[in-house]
């Protein structure tokens, strides 16, 4: 069949050329219109359920809200893990499904389960809401709003009602979360002493205010042949008119709201969170995109919308988009990988020209590159995959191998044409016949060598989870581009050879061999003769090097993925629970000042607390700081160490330092935004926190551990209002009345909405701050008895101070506390091994408590096992492919002896660079084994041809065959190796982090 393909191509040369040009044009067009992203879709199918629970304490939220939701979804079809966090007034449940679950099916399953929960939740709890469908790479843009004279109330209103709707209307946006500033609301602030004076009960106030600002309908009337809609218009946004609403009549005189309360416009209380930019109060707007939406294109649309909005904003309002912009990381990453790809191509050109010394042969070989790459892009596009650093990385790693097939074909055609030209004129064959026979001669080695490399990449496709999502596109891009290069070598390359190499040349035939090729053959022949004369020395030295390399391999550290350089730090600063938002804000400002003192950091933005229905449920004691940076002379690690040093002066604060995407990957893997998570499960939070600190103390001096923290799940101050039931009975006060009194006076109740020029604001009733600002004032609040008399709350209830949990985190319906850590200066697996040893030796857990470990190392161990097993299988398949070609087990085994030689160089490359074996490095070894067998295949195949067709002996065929194939082997090896140099040397640049370990391993292995 391959002969037919070559023959058809040579007989239809114009058709092949036109088809190739059309393919190149179509692929280029597709490349410019394919979605570009930094990584493939890494998100595990996860559905987030969020529930606002008023002012409930964390323990009540856990029992009354979180537990019913967890129970409903736990055990549902496809669910692998359920995590939850219950904080004051808020519940968030993460329902994680198996990786192969369709996200729309997952959301449907959760929605059906939630339908059974609603009736079981308390009346004052909001409806469980599904979070928007997004991903860990979905956070697109953080927009900062600051102002000089505009109030924070007006600034927040602008964000909520002008900017947010405009951004949400942009196609592809999933969510726009606003944090900071003051949320506007209309307030009716009750004064108990005035209510007592006028004899107004709370029930009367609530009866009047509930729905007081809602219009009513009066049906229709017909008059003069017209139909008139009758409306009762009571809705108003005028505070004075609201204040004049009558509550009751006393002795014929009306008592209005303004008589018993302050009616005003104010800021929502309590505040859930606040924000700042460069230490200045701000409003931060976080934009999240929908899945399968182009990041760069959507960012451009959003920035255009913001620029348009800026024209109509107050002059003092500043809009900044440089806080976090994911497209900046994408552009930098893609640009770096593309640069490495281009530079690799230049190295390939240099190698080809040096060895071929002929412009035409170089051009023919290079044509393979663009065609193979555009075919890969077309296949990725029609598979629904994006262009990202992984797919481009696959092409960059393959770029040296893409010209291999063409090199072998062109070199063989060139040699046969030269030999044909040397024949007498009457004995010369037609050019097309020479090209056909020369191409046919190497067709099977070309195809088999390609299949071998493809088989070596098969283990990639057995990876599951996040690592599979990340690395499979790299394998697809590599394999598709490699197959495309083989097809080009069988079709277009012979056609171009017939056109460019088949013309009239000088009498002495085609140009002579290049000087480099002649020089290499001369010296190689000497070395080969010496090696054949000293077989034992060569074998002994090789075995010794292999043993040393094997021993060195087992001393290398192990990690999951290399650290990324995202150009931004994400820093969590957490204080003790129970601290006020104002005090937490002060600590956050100190952290901002310290960060801005670092030269590389030009701006910072901080979120303290959370926004409404925000799945990143941070307490008011936690600040999250985004700190973008630009490296200028110092390395990423040096800047990171200075950040750690600067922030270490914040006494009483726990510091966690990550990067925007990296810490979201960590959170997806273990539920914790750190490399390592020690999960302690139990029932008693105080005991768990004590054990957590014991674990922290036990592992604190482990070499390489950094950012060691215990989750701040500890008790915070509470005020409990506990009814004296016998006194309630004495005064005829029901529990329902008592609960309403506490809720309305303390937390407040939203009784209606106020509509103001297309905007909607809450109308809230609660006690004035002066009457509820301390324990003594709460005791003096007046509750109505059955006769409408005012009774001090202290008569019927105890008001006492106590302690209660601030946050309760759970996993699979079990309370947990996490001791988290990152690594610095040491490999992940060694740090984890030391941690596990310390914990096992020093920690005695009570009955009912247990520890689980989570984080990147789990994925690293699982992926390493998978790759090891599947690599052994791929080696067996490679042996079978070799055996099918040669029908000789010993020859197939000899070719596989290249693998130990390749291992030697790969191991020493790691020893001299990172000193760690990561998943990308393992993949580098796997691909190296496939590439290494290619050269052996070409040699053995040519040895057999010389022995079978020309009757040479073994030694003579080895000498002649090795010299004949030296050029193509050196060209393929050098082009493959040198093309990887840019990736190997620039591993610290954004986008190159994952491909760099692969490139180093392959480069080192090819050299040996």
Task: For each feature predicted by the language model, list its residue ranges.
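Extracytoplasmic/periplasmic membrane-proximal domains and adjacent transmembrane bundles
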Residues: 8, 39, 50, 118, ...
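Signature of alpha-helical transmembrane segments and their immediate interfacial
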Residues: 2-36, 440-442, 510-562, 602, ...
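Hydrophobic transmembrane alpha-helices and their membrane-interface caps
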Residues: 26-32, 37, 318-319, 346-415, ...
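Transmembrane helices with small-residue packing motifs
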Residues: 14, 21-57, 115-124, 381, ...
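Interfacial helix-loop-helix hairpins and adjacent transmembrane helices
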Residues: 1-17, 415-437, 466, 472, ...
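Flexible hinge/switch segments at interdomain interfaces of large molecular machines
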Residues: 36-46, 83-89, 124-148, 177-183, ...
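Helix-loop junctions and hydrophobic alpha-helical segments within the transmembrane domains
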Residues: 330, 334, 410, 415-448, ...
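Solvent-exposed, membrane-proximal periplasmic/extracellular interface segments of envelope transport
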Residues: 60-132, 193-214, 235, 582-672, ...
């Amino acid at each position: 069949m391959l002969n037919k393909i070559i023959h058809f191509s040579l007989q239809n040369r114009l058709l092949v050329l036109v088809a190739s040009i059309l393919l190149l044009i179509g692929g280029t067009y597709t490349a410019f219109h394919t979605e570009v992203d930094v990584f493939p879709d890494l998100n595990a199918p996860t559905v987030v359920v969020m529930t606002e629970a008023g002012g409930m304490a964390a323990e009540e939220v856990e029992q009354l809200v979180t537990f019913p939701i967890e129970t409903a979804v736990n055990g549902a079809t496809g669910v692998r893990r359920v995590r939850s966090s219950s904080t004051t007034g808020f519940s968030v449940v993460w329902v994680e499904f198996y990786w192969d679950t369709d996200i729309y099916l997952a959301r449907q399953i959760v929605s059906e389960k939630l339908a059974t929960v609603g009736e079981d939740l308390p009346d004052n709890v909001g409806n469980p809401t599904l979070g928007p469908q997004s991903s860990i790479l979905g956070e697109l843009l953080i927009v900062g709003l600051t102002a000089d004279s505009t109030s924070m109330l007006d600034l927040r209103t602008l964000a909520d009602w002008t900017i947010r709707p405009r951004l949400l209307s942009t196609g592809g946006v999933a969510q726009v979360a606003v944090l900071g500033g003051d949320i506007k609301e209309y307030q009716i602030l009750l004064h108990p002493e005035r209510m007592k004076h006028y004899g107004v009960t709370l029930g009367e106030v609530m009866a009047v205010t509930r729905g007081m600002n809602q219009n009513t309908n009066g049906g229709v009337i017909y008059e003069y042949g017209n139909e008139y809609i009758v409306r009762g218009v009571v809705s108003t946004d005028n505070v004075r008119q609201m204040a004049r609403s009558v509550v009751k009549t006393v002795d014929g005189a009306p008592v209005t709201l303004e008589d018993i309360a302050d009616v005003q416009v104010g800021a929502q209380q309590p505040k859930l969170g606040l924000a700042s930019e460069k230490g200045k109060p701000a409003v931060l707007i976080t934009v999240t995109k929908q899945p399968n939406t182009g990041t760069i294109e959507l960012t451009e649309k959003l920035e255009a919308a913001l620029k348009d909005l800026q024209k109509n904003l107050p002059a003092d309002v500043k809009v900044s988009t440089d806080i976090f912009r994911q497209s900046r990381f994408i552009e930098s990453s893609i640009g770096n990988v593309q640069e490495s790809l281009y530079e690799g191509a230049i190295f390939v050109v240099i190698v080809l020209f040096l060895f071929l010394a002929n412009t035409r042969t170089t051009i023919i070989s290079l044509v393979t590159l663009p065609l193979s790459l555009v075919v890969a892009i077309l296949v990725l596009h029609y598979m629904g995959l994006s262009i990202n650093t992984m797919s481009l990385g696959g092409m960059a790693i393959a770029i040296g191998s893409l010209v291999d097939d063409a090199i072998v074909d062109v070199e063989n055609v060139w040699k046969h044409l030269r030999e044909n030209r040397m024949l007498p004129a009457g004995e010369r064959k037609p050019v097309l016949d020479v090209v056909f026979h020369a191409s046919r001669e190497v067709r099977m080695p070309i195809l088999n060598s390609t299949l071998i490399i493809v088989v070596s990449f098969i283990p990639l496709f057995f990876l599951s989870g996040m690592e599979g999502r990340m690395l499979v596109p790299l394998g697809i891009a590599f394999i598709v581009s490699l197959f495309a290069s083989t097809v080009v070598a069988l079709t277009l390359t012979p056609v171009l050879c017939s056109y460019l190499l088949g013309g009239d040349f000088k009498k002495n035939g085609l140009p002579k061999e290049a000087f480099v090729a002649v020089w290499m053959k001369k010296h190689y022949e000497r070395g080969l003769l010496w090696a054949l004369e000293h077989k034992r020395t060569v074998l002994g030295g090789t075995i010794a090097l292999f043993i040393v390399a094997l021993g060195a391999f087992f001393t290398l550290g192990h990690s999951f993925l290399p650290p990324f350089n995202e150009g931004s730090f994400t820093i969590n600063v957490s204080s003790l629970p129970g601290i006020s938002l104002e005090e937490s804000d002060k600590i956050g400002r100190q952290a901002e000042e310290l960060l801005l003192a670092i030269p590389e950091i030009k701006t910072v933005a901080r979120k303290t607390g959370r926004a409404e229905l925000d799945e990143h449920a941070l307490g008011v004691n936690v600040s999250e700081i985004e700190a973008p940076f630009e490296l200028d002379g110092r390395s990423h690690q040096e800047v990171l160490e200075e950040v750690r040093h600067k922030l270490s002066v914040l006494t009483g604060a726990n510091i966690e330092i990550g990067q925007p995407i990296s810490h979201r990957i960590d959170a997806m893997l273990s539920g914790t935004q750190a490399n390592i998570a020690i999960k302690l499960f139990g029932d008693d939070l105080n005991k768990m926190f004590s054990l957590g600190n014991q674990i922290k103390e036990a592992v604190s001096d482990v070499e390489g551990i950094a950012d060691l923290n215990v989750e701040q799940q500890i008790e915070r101050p509470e005020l409990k209002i506990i009814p004296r039931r016998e006194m309630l009975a004495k005064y005829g006060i029901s529990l329902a009345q008592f609960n309403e009194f506490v809720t309305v006076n303390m937390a407040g109740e939203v009784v209606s909405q106020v509509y103001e020029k297309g905007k909607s604001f809450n109308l809230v009733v609660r006690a004035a701050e002066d009457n509820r600002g301390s324990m003594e004032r709460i005791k003096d609040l007046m509750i109505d008895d059955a006769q409408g008399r005012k009774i001090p709350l202290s008569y019927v209830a105890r008001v006492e101070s106590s302690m209660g949990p601030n946050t309760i985190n759970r996993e699979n319906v079990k309370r947990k506390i996490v001791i988290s850590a990152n690594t610095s200066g040491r490999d992940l697996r060694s740090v984890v091994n030391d941690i596990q040893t310390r914990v096992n030796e020093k920690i005695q857990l009570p009955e009912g408590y247990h520890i689980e470990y989570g984080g990147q190392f789990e994925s690293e161990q699982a992926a390493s096992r998978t790759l090891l097993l599947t690599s052994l299988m791929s080696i067996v398949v490679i042996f079978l492919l070799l055996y099918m070609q040669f029908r000789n087990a010993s020859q197939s085994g000899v070719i596989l002896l290249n693998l130990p030689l390749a291992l030697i160089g790969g191991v020493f490359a790691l020893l001299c660079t990172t000193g760690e074996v990561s998943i990308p490095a393992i993949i580098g070894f796997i691909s190296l084994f496939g590439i290494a067998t290619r050269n052996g295949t070409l040699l053995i195949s040519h040895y057999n041809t010389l022995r079978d067709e020309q009757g040479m002996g073994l030694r003579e065929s080895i000498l002649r065959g090795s010299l004949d194939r030296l050029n193509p082997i050196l060209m393929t090896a050098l082009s493959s190796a040198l093309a990887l140099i840019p990736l190997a040397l620039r591993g610290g640049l954004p986008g190159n982090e994952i491909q760099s370990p692969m490139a180093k391993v392959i480069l080192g292995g090819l050299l040996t």
